[in-house]
């Protein structure tokens, strides 16, 4: 896919601070900076973790995936994660898009978005 914008694919182990880093950046960037954070669709109830995701059932997730509603989706840690197709139009329009991704699925992201920029976040175990 040709992108006019930038896709930042943030990865790292659970507890490394990805959500905190993404949310802090979102809140503190100046209004004139064209950055959007993709909201993930996840097969987990709302309220687990800091991320404000769209919670769906396994069945609903499967319907969305089959209908092509995700630009990217994967399974990790017993859950399913999806990034909505709206990111495609954001990137086409020149927006920088931040995605909270999966280390194990960087290859899939690269296959779909060859110009993706992977940001690896890590913290020592004592900081988690």
Locations of the language-model features?
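Post-Walker A helix-loop "phosphate-sensing" segment adjacent to the P-loop in P-loop NTPases
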Residues: 27-37
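ATP-dependent small-molecule kinase phosphotransfer cores
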Residues: 40-97, 101-105
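Pre-Walker A (Motif I) flank of P-loop NTPase domains
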Residues: 3-8, 94-95
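ATP-binding Walker
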Residues: 16
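Conserved phosphate-donor/acceptor-positioning beta-strand/loop module used by diverse small-molecule
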Residues: 96-102, 112-128
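P-loop (Walker A) phosphate-binding loop of NTP-binding proteins
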Residues: 11-13
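Walker A/P-loop
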Residues: 19
């Amino acid at each position: 896919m040709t992108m006019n914008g930038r896709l930042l694919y943030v990865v790292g182990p659970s507890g490394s601070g990805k959500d905190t880093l993404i949310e802090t950046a979102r809140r503190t960037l100046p209004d004139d900076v064209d950055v959007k954070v993709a909201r993930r669709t996840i097969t987990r109830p709302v309220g687990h973790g800091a991320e404000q995701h769209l919670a769906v059932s396994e069945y609903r997730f499967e319907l969305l995936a089959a209908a092509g509603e995700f630009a990217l989706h994967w399974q990790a840690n017993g859950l399913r994660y999806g990034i909505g197709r709206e990111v495609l139009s954001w990137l086409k329009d020149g927006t920088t898009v931040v995605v909270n991704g999966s280390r194990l699925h960087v290859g899939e992201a690269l296959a779909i978005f060859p110009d993706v920029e992977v940001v690896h976040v890590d913290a020592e175990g004592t900081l988690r």
